[in-house]
């Protein structure tokens, strides 16, 4: 399949091209913390910033969420913004919202066009179609994701999750798992490579924790389009400081492509 079919372009950033994108999370609890963190992160020039709104203490107030999104946009400029409410079940911070209220908030954020992408978990199966319709209408790219913080499921199951995301209309499929052994890392890499050959959309995969660090450094070689790095504060175990990640990617690519 032509690689151009697998590229998603957001504000000029190519997701799914030859180079992996670096995404850095924003995890502040207050608007003040979020904006301070955004300024610090943007100075380090990530390709994408992810606002983990499940850490925002005022997430129950849609107006405050939109005000904060606007303030983030003003700082981020043309850096693409990914809006995420990670569920507690999939490793997120507990939030005082029902599943319906979360979908309503995603909808309002899409309508505001203050962000470029949203990440919605595959577990919202019934709501995904209507949210996909809204995101398309307002030009917001949609990542559909699966996170397992306890284990690494078999390769076939991981590939199926990514195929499921594409069948639901995702622009990008994401899988994150927890390894218990180096063998689990191979499972993740094999699933990534296999899904890459079957999907017509970009995919993002990683193993978490210290053992999974290698997947954040080398996942792009198997087909993962984005890797997550720490700008100021981590949103998941095993994330690497953005400076270190950029340096390692530079060294590996320099010797891979230039001998």
Curated annotation (Swiss-Prot):
It holds the Pfam family DHquinase_I. Keywords: Amino-acid biosynthesis, Aromatic amino acid biosynthesis, Lyase, Schiff base. The keyword Lyase applies. The active site is at 147 (proton donor/acceptor), 174 (schiff-base intermediate with substrate). GO terms for biological process: 3,4-dihydroxybenzoate biosynthetic process; amino acid biosynthetic process; aromatic amino acid family biosynthetic process; chorismate biosynthetic process. Pathway: Metabolic intermediate biosynthesis; chorismate biosynthesis; chorismate from D-erythrose 4-phosphate and phosphoenolpyruvate: step 3/7. 3-dehydroquinate binds at residues 50-52, 86, 216, 235, 239. GO terms for molecular function: 3-dehydroquinate dehydratase activity. It catalyses: 3-dehydroquinate = 3-dehydroshikimate + H2O. It comes from the Bacteria. Its EC number is 4.2.1.10. It is an enzyme of class 4 (lyase). Transmembrane segments: none annotated. Belongs to the type-I 3-dehydroquinase family. Homodimer. Involved in the third step of the chorismate pathway, which leads to the biosynthesis of aromatic amino acids. Catalyzes the cis-dehydration of 3-dehydroquinate (DHQ) and introduces the first double bond of the aromatic ring to yield 3-dehydroshikimate. NCBIfam families: aroD (TIGR01093). This is 3-dehydroquinate dehydratase. It comes from Geobacillus sp. (strain WCH70). The lineage of its organism: Bacteria, Bacillati, Bacillota, Bacilli, Bacillales.
């Amino acid at each position: 399949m032509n690689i151009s079919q697998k590229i998603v372009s957001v504000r000029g950033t190519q997701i799914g091209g030859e180079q992996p994108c670096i995404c850095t999370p924003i995890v502040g609890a207050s608007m003040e913390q979020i904006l301070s963190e955004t300024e610090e992160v943007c100075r380090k020039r990530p390709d994408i910033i992810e606002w983990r709104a499940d850490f925002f203490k005022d997430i129950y107030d849609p107006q405050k969420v939109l005000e904060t999104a606007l303030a983030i946009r003003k700082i981020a400029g043309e850096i693409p913004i990914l809006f995420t409410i990670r569920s507690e079940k999939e490793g997120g911070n507990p939030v005082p919202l029902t599943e319906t209220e979360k979908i309503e908030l995603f909808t309002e954020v899409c309508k505001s066009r203050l962000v470029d992408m949203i990440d919605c978990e595959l577990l919202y199966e019934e709501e995904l179609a209507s949210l996909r319709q809204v995101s398309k209408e307002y030009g917001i790219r949609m990542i559909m994701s699966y996170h397992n913080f306890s284990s690494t499921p078999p390769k076939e199951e991981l590939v199926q999750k990514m195929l499921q995301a594409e069948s639901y209309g995702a622009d990008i499929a994401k899988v994150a798992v927890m390894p218990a052994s180096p063998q689990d890392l191979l499972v993740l890499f094999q699933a990534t490579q296999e899904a890459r050959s079957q999907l017509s959309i970009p995919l993002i995969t990683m193993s978490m924790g210290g053992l999974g660090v290698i997947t954040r450094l080398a996942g792009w070689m198997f087909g993962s389009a984005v890797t997550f790095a720490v700008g100021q504060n981590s949103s998941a175990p095993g994330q690497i400081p953005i400076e270190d990640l950029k340096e390692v990617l530079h060294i590996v690519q320099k010797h891979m492509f230039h001998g």
